[in-house]
């Protein structure tokens, strides 16, 4: 598999967006990136790791129940706080990633998504983890990308969510 292309963040302003179980992977990215970054974290109700993120970036929180930060989702937090970025790195549930893809297209922001999927074999043979892609996959000869082998990180415009 692959990771986020850190070189794409050089000299740019970056959103690190995590939702639910997609939050922990973004913490390591916050540690590694040496650029201007803002972590936008989406929770159902209970916060975790936000204190750790504060060591490496500005942090904005959204909770579904409004118990902390912005009431709503990560895009609500971005809009409410007037945040801007050149690049998005995101990991979280598919509905969040779908919304971020649309937001990035609308605002012409480079967007990289780490897709969450069960991976049966982990080597691309079983095709249990495929997502629909814009291009024809050279392995399966259909519009698929194997998340375990070709991903899990994709440029948003390469995949259909």
Please name every model-derived segment.
Residues 155, 160-161:
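C-terminal hydrophobic helical "lid"/dimerization subdomain
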């Amino acid at each position: 598999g692959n990771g986020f292309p850190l070189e794409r963040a050089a000299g740019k302003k970056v959103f690190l967006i995590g939702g639910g179980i997609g939050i922990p992977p973004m913490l390591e990215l916050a540690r590694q990136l040496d650029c201007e970054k803002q972590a936008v974290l989406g929770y159902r109700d209970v916060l975790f790791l936000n204190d750790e993120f504060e060591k490496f970036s500005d942090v904005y929180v959204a909770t579904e129940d409004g118990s902390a930060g912005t009431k709503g989702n990560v895009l609500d937090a971005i809009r409410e706080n007037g945040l801007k970025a050149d690049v998005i790195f995101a990991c979280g549930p598919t509905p969040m990633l779908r919304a971020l893809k649309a937001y990035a297209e609308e605002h012409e922001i480079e967007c990289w998504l780490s897709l969450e999927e069960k991976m049966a074999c982990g080597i691309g043979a079983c095709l249990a983890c495929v997502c629909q892609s814009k291009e024809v996959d050279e392995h399966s000869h259909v519009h698929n990308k194997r998340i375990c082998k070709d991903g899990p990180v994709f440029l948003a415009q390469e995949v259909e969510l």
